[in-house]
């Protein structure tokens, strides 16, 4: 870690031109944060990102309990079911890349949100209908993950787009 810190500090040149560099003084940082926080598009993208992440982490924190303890999935098989979530995320990312050739980022974002909401809603409907089996959890969550894979890159890029000289603060 120390070697990497030295390499980064002294071996990688600063890519930003001097006239665009931001000061690390507290007043300058606070001014940047205030500017960023007042931007409605930044707030929208950030809230969208936060909501998608909250759905993701809700699943991550409860999935082992639901699948193993409630639905009886053997612990050695849990990883296989979990791989479906990873596959869904990858499919979403690859779909976003392909759609990026003909759609603007916000159009991809909306499509991803529709897919994610559909997955979450389907899981809720199945649970309320007392459909309790592994696939009633895995398939809707995989659908949610496809949407997540489409949404997250768009929200991050959108949040940073208006602040090219303050990307470190905005991220």
For each predicted feature, which ranges?
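Helix-loop-helix hairpin linking two adjacent transmembrane segments in secondary transporters
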Residues: 1-12, 16, 80
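Juxtamembrane intracellular "pre-TM" segments in multi-pass secondary transporters
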Residues: 13-46
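Pair of pore-lining "gating" transmembrane helices in MFS-fold secondary transporters
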Residues: 38-58, 142-146
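Short amphipathic helix-loop junctions that connect adjacent transmembrane helices
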Residues: 61-77
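Small-residue hotspots at the loop-to-helix junctions and early N-terminal turns
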Residues: 75-83, 171
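Helix-to-loop junctions at the C-terminal end of transmembrane segments
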Residues: 91-107
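C-terminal transmembrane helical hairpin of 12-TM major facilitator-type secondary transporters
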Residues: 107-155
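Paired intracellular helix-loop junctions of major facilitator superfamily
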Residues: 157-168
